[in-house]
Amino acid sequence: MASGVAVSDGVIKVFNDMKVRKSSTPEEVKKRKKAVLFCLSEDKKNIILEEGKEILVGDVGQTVDDPYATFVKMLPDKDCRYALYDATYETKESKKEDLVFIFWAPESAPLKSKMIYASSKDAIKKKLTGIKHELQANCYEEVKDRCTLAEKLGGSAVISLEGKPL
């Protein structure tokens, strides 16, 4: 069921910036987003970038020690969100980076919010083409353990996530 909610151009621009890894200067790389949250606009008609809810690549190792743990703390207790997380992980064969689409719908979120976010998920996913991994979580227990994300990225083949062994 479609909700009629539109995806803002800002969301698509952020996605394209995160997806394309063109050769960049070190300064440009630092400004690239590692994680972002998307929310519904106040009138519930658009999916927009949530202001101030992002981690930049340049923050990692500076103001952010563990990007995944910091990302999990950004998720609201009592409302739904969509998120993009640029996961850096290692398998037995190689190092990889992949974007993960996350649908956060905590059990404590209002029913109306859960319904709108669930019915709008296809709209945002259609705009974010080429995402290989998706994670849906309904409580912090499902996201705080990095093994849950590693499972989505490649199961037992993944040996570390964000430089931390599993």
Curated annotation (Swiss-Prot):
Q: Which residues carry this modification: Phosphoserine?
A: 3, 8, 41, 108, 156
- A GO molecular-function term, please? actin filament binding
Q: Example GO biological process term?
A: modification of postsynaptic actin cytoskeleton
- Cross-link position per record: Glycyl lysine isopeptide (Lys-Gly) (interchain with G-Cter in SUMO2): 132
Q: List the GO terms this entry assigns under cellular component, sorted alphabetically.
A: actin cytoskeleton; cell-cell junction; cofilin-actin rod; cortical actin cytoskeleton; cytoplasm; cytosol; dendritic spine; extracellular exosome
* Sorted UniProt keywords: Acetylation, Actin-binding, Cell membrane, Cell projection, Cytoplasm, Cytoskeleton, Host-virus interaction, Isopeptide bond, Membrane, Nucleus, Phosphoprotein, Ubl conjugation
Annotated positions of the Phosphothreonine modification: 25, 63
Induction summary: Up-regulated in response to enterovirus 71 (EV71) infection (at protein level).
* Record's subcellular location: Nucleus matrix; Cytoplasm, Cytoskeleton; Cell projection, Ruffle membrane; Cell projection, Lamellipodium membrane
Tissue specificity field: Widely distributed in various tissues.
Q: List residues of the ADF-H domain.
A: 4-153
Carrying Phosphotyrosine, the residues are 68, 82, 140
Q: Give a short account of its post-translational modification.
A: Inactivated by phosphorylation on Ser-3. Phosphorylated on Ser-3 in resting cells. Dephosphorylated by PDXP/chronophin; this restores its activity in promoting actin filament depolymerization. The phosphorylation of Ser-24 may prevent recognition of the nuclear localization signal. Phosphorylated via a ARRB1-RAC1-LIMK1-PAK1 cascade upon active ligand stimulation of atypical chemokine receptor ACKR2.
- Record's PROSITE patterns? ADF_H
Residues annotated with N-acetylalanine modification: 2
Query: Which Gene3D superfamilies is this protein grouped with?
Result: Severin (3.40.20.10)
Q: What does this protein do?
A: Binds to F-actin and exhibits pH-sensitive F-actin depolymerizing activity. In conjunction with the subcortical maternal complex (SCMC), plays an essential role for zygotes to progress beyond the first embryonic cell divisions via regulation of actin dynamics. Required for the centralization of the mitotic spindle and symmetric division of zygotes. Plays a role in the regulation of cell morphology and cytoskeletal organization in epithelial cells.
Q: How does the record describe its quaternary structure? A: Can bind G- and F-actin in a 1:1 ratio of cofilin to actin. It is a major component of intranuclear and cytoplasmic actin rods. Interacts with the subcortical maternal complex (SCMC) via interaction with TLE6 isoform 1 and NLRP5. Interacts with C9orf72. (Microbial infection) Interacts with human respiratory syncytial virus (HRSV) matrix protein; this interaction probably facilitates viral replication.
The UniProt family comment states: Belongs to the actin-binding proteins ADF family.
This chain belongs to the protein called Cofilin-1
